[in-house]
Design a protein with these regions (language model features):
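Classical eukaryotic N-terminal signal peptides for Sec-dependent ER targeting/secretion
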Residues: 1-10, 230-232, 236
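N-terminus-centered regions that define maturation/targeting leaders and the start
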Residues: 15-223, 227-249
Length: 249
């Protein structure tokens, strides 16, 4: 008798074995981090999204088989393709988000993954993607989920301005703060050029069938308060981040 495995399950198992970060990037991870922007889900590593789709911080979910109810998790998102500095030739990184305090919830994503939630906003509040329309490449945005060290103590003042986030070295950060390898990862692309279009996207549903939505009211990060601002003229050099100020309440 022949047994057929549902294609969705096959795709999920294949995803577990494939690298979930861009080629050449470290740290690596082979487990997929589910990344959900409102009802738009990053189904495939490297998928292209419309800039507007990623305007707010995504929800996260991890394979239920990997969930440890006692574990606290940390989320990091990086842009790997910030245009070079004046006179430079190498693209740089930008820390778009570092959010601590994630814990497993009781909600399931399509019965296979557990939604995570945090009441914290920092130490580096979310900056949405915004690659310049004048750039020549689509930017790669990497999402990483780490087990959060109990002793981790990062002040919000460390990322008070966008300039403090440029050139962020995730490997050095991990070494200096005792952060172990990521448990899961994912990445997507956003192309700032007007002619760019998003590739296939999917919707995410919780076990009850309702579209996954954020739960709880985010509270202030407990680190030092700081203001994030982009000096006029700096925007074009970065990933197209609009002029804004985010106050860590």
């Amino acid at each position: 008798m022949m047994h057929f495995i549902p294609s969705v399950l096959v795709a999920g198992l294949v995803g577990l074995a494939q690298a979930q970060v861009p080629s050449g990037f470290t740290p690596q991870a082979t487990t997929k981090l589910e990344v959900i922007f409102n009802s738009t889900m990053v189904n495939t590593a490297g998928q292209q999204l419309a800039k507007a789709s990623a305007a707010t911080q995504p929800q996260l979910a991890l394979s239920s088989a990997m969930i440890d109810a006692s574990q606290t998790y940390m989320f990091v998102m990086l842009d790997l393709d910030v245009p070079p500095a004046d006179g430079g030739t190498e693209r740089r990184t930008l820390l778009h988000c570092m959010n601590t305090g994630f814990k497993a919830t009781k909600q399931q994503l399509m019965g296979a993954a557990t939604l995570l939630a945090s009441s914290e906003k920092g130490p580096a509040p979310y900056i949405p993607p915004g690659p310049p329309a004048t750039d020549t490449v689509a930017h790669r945005y990497v999402e990483l989920l780490f087990p959060q060290p109990a002793s981790l103590n990062i002040q919000a003042s460390a990322f008070a301005g966008v300039q403090d986030r440029i050139g962020f070295d995730i490997q050095s950060f991990m070494s200096q703060n005792g952060v172990s390898a990521p448990l899961a990862a994912n990445f997507f692309r956003v192309d700032g050029r007007i002619s760019a279009t998003a590739s296939g996207t999917g919707s995410a549903t919780v076990a009850s069938g309702a579209v996954a939505t954020p739960t709880g009211t985010p509270q202030a990060f407990t680190g030092a308060a700081g203001e994030i601002s982009v000096p006029y003229g700096t925007v074009g050099l970065l990933s197209g981040v609009a002029l804004f100020a985010v106050l860590v309440l």
